[in-house]
Amino acid sequence: MEVTVLIPNYNGLKFLYDCIDCLKKQSIKDFRILVVDNASADESVKWLKENNIDTLVLDKNYGFAGGVNAGIKEVDTAYTILLNNDTKADVYYVENLLKAIKTEEKVFSVSPMMIQAQDNNRIDDAGDGLCIIGFAYQIGVGESIKRYEKKMKVFAACAGAAIYDTALLKELGAFDEAHFAYLEDVDLGYRARLYGYKNLYEPSAKVIHIGSATSGSKYNDFKVKLAARNNIYLHYKNQPLLQLIINALPIALGMFIKFLFFAKKGFLKAYIEGIKEGFASYKKCKRVDFKKVKLSTLIIIEFELIINMFKFVLHFIKRRIDRLY
């Protein structure tokens, strides 16, 4: 057995049947399914036990990061797939992710083609990006799936359906539990990149994703606050002091843009609270050991952050164009 499919769950009973049923229909059968339940208040645990699904039941809600980390400690296979409960995997999903992570050396993670449940012709996520103004973004979201039929390198994998090298996952410290939820996958992918590993996108592995099943909506106070706070953590942890100084103005610009955006959306208070909490508590985060990071790697990533700014704008334009058809 080479891979464990790890499914974090919190009050997700209504999604579990479809998610696990798709896994039972996979082209390969030799893998473990492990559900980590974050103290659900619905009947998730009862259903899982009745259906003989291997389940790790936690005593409280540790968030995505804490829940997944608890599950990772129980994994003894070479690879770990993290799969959101609100997904439906294509029959070749597990097989094609396994093939993809073995194709190159120094691959840490591989992100599949995540497809929007409400429109199966559009991308939900083709990996995650990060740009110089501090915006983390879903690559391809809202665009036609036809634009994303080729393999490529990505800044980070989306932990909603990605495969990871288990040994590296544990070596890198897995997910930062200070994040609780949101941006923890970008943080992990960034960390892997700094230490010289790659994150890939594999279009032949496909999942349909509902999205925001646990938090309840695209934007809410909880999500906006945590994402704002975690964005502070993300930069503090993964950029040395000189790089933070160089990027201070672009990041401030990004924060100002989000300030205006969330003011318009009615979430300004939550955004400001998140920023305040981020600056008040960032030192509790464990920074990357920059003594182990090559200068050339930092320079390459800095240029990538700049290039990703243009890619982010291009994605925005393409998304608007695709909506016309």
Where are these regions (language model features)?
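Glycine-rich, basic loop-to-helix element that forms the pyrophosphate-binding segment
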Residues: 58-75, 85
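A short, conserved alpha-helix in the catalytic core of glycosyltransferases
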Residues: 155-206
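Non-catalytic, C-terminal membrane-associated alpha-helical segments of glycosyltransferases
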Residues: 244-325
